[in-house]
Amino acid sequence: MADSKPATLSSVAASGFLAASERVKPHTKLIALLALGHFVIDANQGALPAVLPFLKQWHGLTYAQVAMLVLAGNLTSSLIQPLFGYLSDRIARRWVLPVSIVVSGVGVALLGLAPGYAASLALVVVMGLGVASWHPEGYKTASGVAGERKATALSLFSLGGNVGIAVGAPLVTFLVAGFGSQGTLGMLVPTAIVGTLMLAAMPMITRESIPRAGGRARVRGANMPGAMAVLILVVTVRAWATLGFSTFVPFYYVDTLKADPTIVGVLLFVFLGAGALGTVIAGPIADRVGPRPFIRWVLPMSLPFGVLFLLSHGPLAFVALACFGAVLTSSFSVSVLLAQAYLPRNAGMASGLIVGFAIGLGGAGVTALGWVADRWGVPTALWISALMPLVAFAVARFLPPPRDLAAA
């Protein structure tokens, strides 16, 4: 089994994945700023699952309507990302980075003021559009300043997003518990601060997110659309499991176990926060063993923890939930790296297809889980989600090695 060497790959704004003539170090400050922007954009998105039980109570929604809100969020924040990625590959639009942060923040902040289901649905769409426009440009820009250890750098960039998703839930829960439905307006504070910082950094981002290897870089490799299709299917099934848990674990505790609704934020923080930790650990490992072998074998490793969570109670259930989130989510940024290797000429679109389209398809699966929960109960929906990594593993066996990586 040969080691993958993602460190030999670099990217530019207009053309995608590139091989540069010399090794370069990552631009640490810009990666940190982009990770901070990723934190806020995904905190806004991550607040949605925690708001859902409140919206259900305020407006008398059914589980199917709740699942439709999830679907709307994922359709707009995910499925249309390849379009933004395509536009990003053709013409760099760095101004999208600060603008998308503001748009996503406004969408989630006004949810507490929505008069009913239709208005809530519209605001979820607004939030989703901000998220969708951010990710292709953000991942491509981060890749452009990542230097030679791409898996490690992208894992740190992804850490910002994963921590944001984890923090968004308890933050909005705290705001609503303390200030009522108007508490969601508090999400505008981090949005305004980081959006302003991102806007101020635009000149530096534009200057530094070009090849810094000391010479002309050339596009390397041909696209592998068939391999990309297999990877999209793997990520779709993995996203189905992840979104299934983040959506229905709160209802499992509140409606089935009759727990206090304020525990929702803690549950999501445990699950998604552990996922953020798993992403950081995954980067250096994937740099050593290669993205394809890592993705293949990490998926079945998550299965026992999902099952253990559903069979246990108390502290053990929290530990199992954390382990399930950490292992299942660890391949997130590695999947983006492999996607960029499969589509070396379209880095923005590759990011959009994985972070957006594939995860959006997984969100469509959550709608089916909502139908299952309405008819057979929330535990059944969670059991289906817990077994999804086994399906993803079976599909991942068909992932071919990228032509320009020495992956096994």
Placement of each model-derived feature along the sequence:
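Structural signature of the two symmetry-related core transmembrane helices
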Residues: 95-110, 293-307, 386
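C-terminal transmembrane helical hairpin of 12-TM major facilitator-type secondary transporters
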Residues: 286-335
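Helix-loop-helix hairpin linking two adjacent transmembrane segments in secondary transporters
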Residues: 157-204
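Cytoplasmic helix-loop-helix junction between adjacent transmembrane helices
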Residues: 123-160
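Helix-to-loop junctions at the C-terminal end of transmembrane segments
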Residues: 80-92, 278-290, 373-374
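Conserved MFS/SLC helix-loop-helix module at the cytosolic interface between two early adjacent transmembrane helices
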Residues: 79-115
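Residue-level signature of mid-helix packing/kink "hotspots" within the transmembrane helices
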Residues: 46, 74-82, 165-166, 272-280, ...
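Extracytoplasmic gate region of multi-pass secondary transporters
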Residues: 48-49, 226-272, 276
